[in-house]
Amino acid sequence: MASIGIGCGSYFYASRYAEYGLSAVAILGPGTVAFFGSVKIARVLHHRITQGRWTQKENSAWWKNDTNSIRWNSLIPLMVTLVTSYSFTICMTYAWGFASQAGLNQGIISSVMNLLAIFDCIVFYFAFGEKVGWIHIVGVLLMIASIVCIGFAVNASEEDDEVDEDADEEDDEIDTGGRSKALNGILAIAIGLGAPVSLTIQHYFIRKHSGVYTGQAQAFDVAPLLNIVFCFFMPQLMDQLDVTWEDIFVGGAAGSMMESGRVLISYSIAVGLAGPVTAIVNANIAYQTILGVLLASQSLDTFQVSGILLGFLGVCAISLFDNVVKKVKLTRRLSSLRS
């Protein structure tokens, strides 16, 4: 569900506003803040009506019921999640920009996010003793192969279209920003690596503090704060785009879907295996591709079809096959005990 939410939200956001760079995040802000603000108000009112109180202090991440004091430690995961969300957005935006100036396929940068599953597996193994089975490893590898296939295929086709349109134009040369292509390529990869590192740090703190401050609560509290800051980019965006109410609605819907997906990710990270979870979520690019086919009449090439099929097999390996193996092992144990 998290992968579907992020994939659908990313499609509607990227297809309309990605060309405006970092300032495009402003279009996500107003609607997303309104959505999560409304949900928070509705939850408070529901609790007031059903329990007769505005808050539930005994289960609050922000209140110590035994000492009747504020739980200041909850600020740590909140601020870490907020800062790492900003750093992820900034790293990906500038990495794509440098990749374009280096003449690189931007799918390389998108594929760097595959390292997140590997980073999570390593960090969670040493920090929490979390181990993954061979089926999970196979599933993660299939998901990585899926994203690589789709990422390279989509971006390669976009670059081919641009080359065909501009082949006869004199200004077809790449704007390197005054730097060499080699330097731009190094900057693209180096900054792009900051994105999975940022989310690995975020996932570590989500799990570490999940006993008191649940993963979904952290993400739910961060979502409006993150998008309030995005709103400050609106003047910069309005210099490039005549923003309409339709844009606000589409941006809000896209932002709400992506943030809802992140809430589900945070919950899954807190209670499940971090590496396989992030591998499945990274398959959101497959949903973007499918929406492009259904809504924009885009065609699928061999790489994209292969990527979607590999992604499906990866999900099955991580979730379905794992349950089957567990049931088989349980059946064998019961049989041995009976005998």
What are these regions (language model features)?
Residues I135-N155, E165, E169-G177, F303-D322:
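Hydrophobic transmembrane alpha-helices of multi-pass small-molecule transport proteins
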Residues M1-A26, G37-V39, E159-V212, L330-S339:
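Glycine-/small-residue-enriched transmembrane alpha-helix faces in small-molecule transporters
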